[in-house]
Design a protein with these regions (language model features):
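Conserved FAD/dinucleotide-binding core of flavoprotein oxidoreductases
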Residues: 85-99, 103-106, 148-149, 197-200, ...
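A conserved short coil-to-beta-strand element within the FAD-binding core of flavoproteins
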Residues: 125-139
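Active-site-adjacent segment of FAD-dependent monooxygenases/related oxidoreductases
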Residues: 44, 48-114
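Glycine-rich FAD pyrophosphate-binding loop
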Residues: 24-44
Length: 396
């Protein structure tokens, strides 16, 4: 027997969980299919920007996130041991004058709890989508359950929040365009070696050997992200949340951090390590009829700048009331205004991420001095408040 629901969300990661909770709070009957049976582990994406915290407030997730997260109130740019300038988030948002960091598995756990509170049976772990059939005013989705059994549901709308390798997008036949970048980065979480006064400060060192960014984390930890450089000397350690980090790779990252910034990160304290290459992808359409794509399924951008997950949350926050209204009124999509606004936001975020990458690439001596002068000027101008709003995603 095929079950029925108002909205099927495919993908129970951070974006799908928020959308499911928003819909449930609006009185919409929702199912969230997540192919993974187990709860994901690891810190992964850590940055949560002010507009996302505002969206979390609608489901009561802001308070528990803030109770666990670390508030980042400023960013400091450095080079060759000297401070180039400071970017304060004090006026970046009226509600949350900071960016916060929290391990992704904890953010997901909080969102999962809020979905469970609003719709106890909505999340279906271990269910993988295999087919979509659009029939007039409904979409029939088929899949396999945790034991391989067939599963099906008939929904008024289906939302693909299933990531960069979206099954929903593939089933719709929607192609992506984009490019791969040569930049290779390695990130790792260590016991924070920075002075105690920097526990609320993000640090960006744009020295001649390549950028090192770092962000404070709860529990006295700090995330370091380093450009591997033209020789890719830091390698590309694989993401293995179930295993201890590779010690040789952890030592290589710690050595790069020490050489470029002077901070003495202890490789023995490394709890997460992963390499990643940057790519940008955009779906040619954000959906077909009653099927909509959001998050990485619709637009994948560079992780540098920490905007990708937040973009998906803001997609969800804008889509939820559209879906709730359409369900109540018996209307159908698509919503070209939604697609246009979210595509514009994704392109802006992608350009910003590309600018961030460009500022962190190795340069010759003369060009590097020019970059330092540019950053000193940009961070000293009265317009630095506008720059802070840009980095805090107030435009999104």
């Amino acid at each position: 027997v095929t079950a029925e629901t108002d909205v099927l969300v495919v993908g129970g990661g951070p974006v799908g969980l928020l959308l499911g909770a928003l819909l449930a709070r609006a009185g919409v009957d929702v199912q969230v299919w997540e192919r993974r049976s187990s709860v994901p582990r690891g810190s992964r994406a850590i940055g949560i920007h002010p507009p996302s915290l505002d969206a979390f407030a609608a489901i009561g997730a802001d308070a528990p996130v803030l109770a666990e997260a670390t508030r980042v109130r400023e960013g400091v740019a450095r080079s060759r041991g000297r401070t180039l300038g400071t970017l304060s988030f004090a006026r970046a948002s009226a509600t949350h004058p900071y960016v916060v960091t929290l391990d992704q598995h904890r953010t997901e756990a909080i969102l999962r709890e809020r979905l469970e509170a609003a719709a106890p049976d909505a999340l279906r772990p271990g269910v993988a989508l295999t087919g979509l059939l659009r029939r007039g005013s409904t979409v029939e989705a088929t899949g396999t359950g945790p034991g391989g059994e067939p599963v099906s549901v008939r929904a008024a709308f289906v939302v693909g929040a299933d990531g960069a390798r979206s099954t929903v997008r593939d089933l719709l036949g929607i192609r992506t365009t984009g490019r791969d970048y040569p930049d290779l980065y390695v990130m790792g979480d260590f016991a924070d070696p920075e002075p105690g006064g920097l526990t609320g400060t993000a640090l960006v060192d744009v020295g001649p050997a390549g950028v090192v960014e770092s962000f404070p984390l709860p529990g006295g930890r700090r995330r370091y992200v380093a450009l591997s450089g033209p020789d890719r000397s830091l390698g590309a350690p694989a993401w293995r949340p179930e295993e201890a980090p590779d010690q040789e790779a952890a030592r290589a990252l710690a050595a790069a951090v020490r050489d470029r910034t002077g901070a003495d990160a202890d490789p023995e304290t490394c709890t997460m390590l992963s390499g990643f290459q940057v790519r940008r992808r955009e779906a040619e359409r954000m959906g077909v009829g009653r099927v909509v794509l959001i998050g990485d399924a619709a637009h994948e951008i560079s992780p540098i700048g920490g905007q990708g997950m937040n973009l998906g949350w803001l997609d969800a926050a804008e889509l939820a009331p559209l879906l709730a209204g359409a369900v109540r009124r018996g209307e159908a999509g698509p919503w070209p205004g939604f697609a246009r606004r979210r595509t514009t936001a994704a392109r802006r975020a992608a350009r910003q991420a590309e600018a961030n990458m460009a500022l962190g690439r190795p340069l010759g001596s003369l060009a590097h001095r020019g970059r330092e002068a540019f950053l000193r000027t940009a961070l000293a101008l009265p317009t630095s408040d506008l720059l802070a709003r840009v980095y805090a995603m107030r435009w999104s």
